[in-house]
Every structure is written in C-alpha cells, then in structure tokens.
Amino acid sequence: MLDAQTIATVKATIPLLVETGPKLTAHFYDRMFTHNPELKEIFNMSNQRNGDQREALFNAIAAYASNIENLPALLPAVEKIAQKHTSFQIKPEQYNIVGEHLLATLDEMFSPGQEVLDAWGKAYGVLANVFINREAEIYNENASKAGGWEGTRDFRIVAKTPRSALITSFELEPVDGGAVAEYRPGQYLGVWLKPEGFPHQEIRQYSLTRKPDGKGYRIAVKREEGGQVSNWLHNHANVGDVVKLVAPAGDFFMAVADDTPVTLISAGVGQTPMLAMLDTLAKAGHTAQVNWFHAAENGDVHAFADEVKELGLSLPRFTAHTWYRQPNEADRAKGQFDSEGLMDLSKLEGAFSDPTMQFYLCGPVGFMQFAAKQLVDLGVKQENIHYECFGPHKVL
C-alpha cells in the first residue's frame, strides 16, 4: 500500500503530465530502445512508428496517477494489458527496465526533485507487482490447461485460404501433434515471426475465427497497406511453413447463457472475433435471438459471407444485415448486401429491443464509436456493450 504522502506527491504531477502529453512517452520509448535495443524484439515497432503505443502508454500513466488511491477502478485496464503482455511473454525483470527508464524520463524532462522521483518509484513498483502477479496467473493457467503450453510452440500452416481481396485465413496445427488449448470465443493468438530480412522479431495478435476444436487454430489476416507482417503472411507464408505461437489470450470474449440474446456488430476485419462467437453459438444450438450486423466497403473485401450464412441457418432465431458503403455493379447484380451507405442501426431497432441482449463490437475505432453511440441513443445500457480494439486500446 502507498502512504498518503506518496499518493499526494504523484497526484500533484498530473497537471504536468497532461500538459506534456504523449511527448513524455515518446521520450521514454526513445530512451529505452536506445539503452535496451533488445526490447525491439518484443514491442510492436509498427505501433511505435505510428504513435499509437505512445498515446496508449501515456493514457495508462495518466489514468494510474488519477486513480492511484483507487486501484480497483483500474482492474479492467490491468486485465486487458496483462492479457496482451502474455502474448509478448513479458517477464518480471523487464518491469525493472521499464521502471528505470520511466523515472529517468521524468527526471530528464521535468527535473522534479528526488521526492517526486521516489514517490513515482514507489507507485510504479506497486503497479508493476499487480501486473507481474496477474501475468504469472495467466501463464500458469495457460500451461496447466489441457493442450496448453509455456512460452512459444511450433505450429505448421496446414491451410491458407483467400477469403476476400484483403483477408486470408490460416489454419495451424501443432508440429508435435499434440492437443491444443481451448479458448473463449473472441480471444486471440500471439504469432511470433522473424523471417529473413526482418530487422527485428515481430509479434502480432490475431483473433481466432471459429469454435475451439482441440486440434488446431484458425486465424484471418487483413493485408494492411505498408504492414510488414500482414504482407509477409499474404505474400510469402505457405502451407507447410512453421510459425511460433503463444497460447490464446485476451479479455474480450463472449460468455452468455443459452437464453441470452446476442448482437454481433463488426466492420471489415473486425468480423474475425465475431466469427468465433457465431460459430460457438451455432454449434451450441443457441435458442435466443442472434443478430449479425456487418459493414464492408463492397463485396470484393467482404470475407466469410458464405460461412456466416451457413452458420445462421443452424440457429433458430437469426437475423443478418450487411451494409456496403460503396457497392459495385457486381454487388448490385448479385444482391449480396442489404443496405448501401454507413451502418444505420435505427432501422433495425426492433431486432434488439430485449434489455438483456449483449452487444459485441469490433472494427475500426471510429466505426465502433459510431455504432456504440447509436446503441446508447436507442436505449442500450453501456454495460451491455463490449468491444475490442485491434492494436493499442482506446476508449469509445
């Protein structure tokens, strides 16, 4: 526990943190990667280049300072970050490195004096221990469950299937021939790659796209413009190649009773975790209402349409609606979308009038903000809306 003086000292630095903004974390990362370049093998350097990770870390530091006397308020954020950390295989000793550079950054940017540095040192130590302990629990859970493992495990690509102009699915089975750990629908795999020509090892998280079967995993990858890893997977990864995987993780998952109605809302590649949820509901014979609402640019980039249709046929109460923002002539001829333009949920209000319905959202942040606002305006409670950001977390 932190004493009152330490808490007061840390909270007194909040205005300075807010004024400085992500410049603080930019300095921190530049310093850390200069002194500890080996950490480039762990961090997603693409998120470093576009600034997303710097913004996310700054928001986390500011949130911690603001809630330092109320740590339970931070537990949902801690769980999200701890789950992600396990896919990077973060170890306790790396927290010492981060703490060293955080304090050095505060000193170099602000020269706040030893009292402030000592207070932040204590505060960081408390937070680091929260993460270390939770991550140890997750590592132990992953290693002890049936088909689970520690660290990375070699998997072979057994199928590679283009699903649209931008999305390709990969089916993976363990090289050792053993069983694989089950997961909750909505969770992701940690994929570790360092092909020839890559300056650093790259680690990515890709959502699992079907119900667990104990034999292997399926992920789907969108080709991102300029994306080093996604383009390598699309262009160079082949059936028979071996990649390293970390056990499934993630705090975004579906957990509902048989009589709970569910709405799955997605845009683009955001449908990937929703596919695992829909597959799980279909194979469980879910009796309550299930809605599938999806937005895509057009039919060329709309993946898994046939699979969704087939799964929906096995559900007794299923409604699907697809929006194409800019349908092409082939889309119009085939009639494979329901509405043109942006997703407008107000026209489907009757499909989710049940107050117990749970809503799961995934897609670009702007899309999720747009969809969540519509839901709230239609009377949906915030606690019934669950969402996942690909990349560093952002609040809707």
Swiss-Prot record:
InterPro entries noted in UniProt: Cbr1-like_FAD-bd_dom, FAD-bd_FR_type, FNR_nucleotide-bd, Globin, Globin-like_sf, Globin/Proto, Hmp, OxRdtase_FAD/NAD-bd
Annotated NADP(+) binding sites: G268, V269, G270, Q271, T272, P273
Site feature Influences the redox potential of the prosthetic heme and FAD groups, where: K84, E388
SUPFAM superfamilies found in the cross-reference section: Ferredoxin reductase-like, C-terminal NADP-linked domain, Globin-like, Riboflavin synthase domain-like
Cofactor(s) needed for function: heme b; FAD
Record field: catalytic activity: 2 nitric oxide + NADPH + 2 O2 = 2 nitrate + NADP(+) + H(+); 2 nitric oxide + NADH + 2 O2 = 2 nitrate + NAD(+) + H(+)
GO MF annotation list: FAD binding; heme binding; metal ion binding; nitric oxide dioxygenase NAD(P)H activity; oxygen binding; oxygen carrier activity
Protein's GO biological process: cellular response to nitrosative stress; nitric oxide catabolic process; response to toxic substance
Keywords of the record: Detoxification, FAD, Flavoprotein, Heme, Iron, Metal-binding, NAD, NADP, Oxidoreductase, Oxygen transport, Transport
Function: Is involved in NO detoxification in an aerobic process, termed nitric oxide dioxygenase (NOD) reaction that utilizes O(2) and NAD(P)H to convert NO to nitrate, which protects the bacterium from various noxious nitrogen compounds. Therefore, plays a central role in the inducible response to nitrosative stress.
Domain observations: Consists of two distinct domains; an N-terminal heme-containing oxygen-binding domain and a C-terminal reductase domain with binding sites for FAD and NAD(P)H.
Full protein name: Flavohemoprotein
Organism: Escherichia coli O6:H1 (strain CFT073 / ATCC 700928 / UPEC)
